[in-house]
Regions:
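An accessory alpha-helical subdomain
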Residues: 87-90, 94-168
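Catalytic cores of RNA-modifying enzymes
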Residues: 1-112, 163-173
Length: 174
């Protein structure tokens, strides 16, 4: 009896997910990062994925990346086991890993910031500051003195790791 299981067919980046509390998937390796950004906007208990082993290095911070900041803001990460290429048909050319992600409260500033990944940096920051009680005028002024204009004009999704760190330093001093 599989009444409690839903299968979602289609491009995972384009389809609306059905209501769920857990997701298990062998993610398309070329879409892992994009899908983690999409899942950050979803409400769930846990995600269990098979991903490239090298990708787990980006999740844990072994390789410094924007993705590590996303993980820190949204997820508790467990890496369970490595899966050799022979376990698949057809075989990938690389090792894989099984990971579990659970939502966490995380850094509220980073969470709010990343949730608006499709907006310009200055607009997202202005909205965050207005939610914290500033007027629109005060928020615009604070953004203009805290963040260089070249960063303000970029969409969050296009910011480099260094630019994200600069935003964080400008607002929460880390």
């Amino acid at each position: 009896n599989f009444n409690h299981i839903s299968f979602c067919l289609g491009n995972a980046l384009e389809v609306d997910f059905p209501k769920y509390n857990k997701c298990v998937s062998n993610l398309p390796y070329t879409l892992c990062e994009a899908l983690l950004w999409k899942f950050s906007r979803e409400d769930f208990e846990s995600l269990v994925f098979v991903v490239p082993k090298k990708f787990t290095g980006r999740l844990t911070g072994i390789v410094e990346s924007r993705l590590k900041l996303l993980i820190d803001a949204f997820y508790e990460l467990d890496i369970f086991d490595d899966v050799p290429p022979e376990a698949f048909d057809p075989q990938p050319k690389i090792m894989s890993s099984i990971i579990r992600l659970k939502p966490k409260k995380g850094n509220l500033f980073l969470r709010e910031f990343f949730m608006q990944y499709d907006k310009k940096t200055k607009n997202a920051l202005r909205e965050i500051l207005m939610k914290s009680g500033m007027t629109k005028k005060e928020a615009i002024k604070q953004v203009s003195i805290s963040i260089p204009l070249r960063i303000q004009e970029k969409n969050i999704v296009n910011l480099s790791l260094e630019e994200i760190k600069e935003v964080v330093r400008g607002f929460i001093g880390e």
